[in-house]
């Protein structure tokens, strides 16, 4: 089902293949003079029927196809991804690139990998309540690191953080 409103096109079809996403994106770009952004929520819900017996190869094909689509249409593709549960076993729960579920090809193909971390999710008595961290795990053309934001849970909103950006400030 396609919802078109104020130049935002939402397709909530489930289990799309990269070929179907590419076809729909091309059509929208042709009919509306381009696309500003493609967002996939989330990558692991996509399928490649010919590779369905090997999930690693399937995710690799999905990742490569989305990268090719970004280049073809000259548009950023934001693909949301699940994390492995392995981070639950670590003392520091901040995600790292290898925590991306079926991560090898995603990590390789991505130009930018970002995570959102909120300490209060894992530690009830955290000193960092109301603070979120944007962790830049990979940036092909720039630095990696962490940026703090204020998180307003009532509105699910992130704002500029006015306090110290790092623990040692």
Description of each model-found segment:
Residues 2-4:
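Short, small-residue-biased leader/transition segments that mark boundaries at the very start
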Residues 27, 35-80:
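Helical hairpin unit composed of two closely spaced alpha helices linked by a short loop
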């Amino acid at each position: 089902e396609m919802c078109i409103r104020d130049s935002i096109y939402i397709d909530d079809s489930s289990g799309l293949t990269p070929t179907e996403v590419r076809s729909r994106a091309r059509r929208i770009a042709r009919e509306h003079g381009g696309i500003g952004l493609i967002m996939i929520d989330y990558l692991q819900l996509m399928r490649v029927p010919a590779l369905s017996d090997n999930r690693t190869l399937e995710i690799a094909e999905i990742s490569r196809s989305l990268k090719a689509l970004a280049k073809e249409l000259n548009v950023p593709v934001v693909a949301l991804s699940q994390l492995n549960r392995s981070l639950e076993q670590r003392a520091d729960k901040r995600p790292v690139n290898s925590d991306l579920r079926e991560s090898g090809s995603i990590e390789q193909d991505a130009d930018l990998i970002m995570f959102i971390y909120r300490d209060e999710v894992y530690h009830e008595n955290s000193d960092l309540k109301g603070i979120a961290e944007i962790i830049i795990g990979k940036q092909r053309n720039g630095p990696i690191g962490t940026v703090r934001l204020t998180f307003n849970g009532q509105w699910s909103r992130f704002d500029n953080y006015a306090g110290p950006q790092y623990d040692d400030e």
